[in-house]
Amino acid sequence: MLKPLGDRVIIEVTEAAEQTVGGIVLANNAKDKPVTGKVVAVGSGYVLNDGSKQDLTVKSGDQVLFDKYAGQEVSFEGADYLALHEKDIVAIVE
């Protein structure tokens, strides 16, 4: 399994819709880049100025919204993930 470092988070991305609400099938280049996903792993946290650590707000299993162009795509053991910093996560979906 992937173990991110520091304030990084590994996201299993939710795929973009294949067709519109009206039933129009979208070409691959017409789909919006996904902005939602499930957190599958989190780093150990932030190192503060005094040397202490602060845990991340998100945790494994959280469904999140993130910035459209954030992160780096990563493939591991045949699966695709997105590695990003916690600051690029906009919200936790409840």
From Swiss-Prot:
Domain of life of the source: Bacteria
SUPFAM superfamilies linked: GroES-like (SSF50129)
Subcellular localization(s) per the UniProt record: Cytoplasm
Gene Ontology biological process terms, A to Z: chaperone cofactor-dependent protein refolding
One Gene Ontology cellular component: cytoplasm
Location (main, coarse): cytoplasm
Function: Together with the chaperonin GroEL, plays an essential role in assisting protein folding. The GroEL-GroES system forms a nano-cage that allows encapsulation of the non-native substrate proteins and provides a physical environment optimized to promote and accelerate protein folding. GroES binds to the apical surface of the GroEL ring, thereby capping the opening of the GroEL channel.
Assembly notes: Heptamer of 7 subunits arranged in a ring. Interacts with the chaperonin GroEL.
Family named by the database record: Belongs to the GroES chaperonin family.
Name of the molecule in the record: Co-chaperonin GroES
Organism of derivation: Leuconostoc citreum (strain KM20)
Source lineage: Bacteria, Bacillati, Bacillota, Bacilli, Lactobacillales
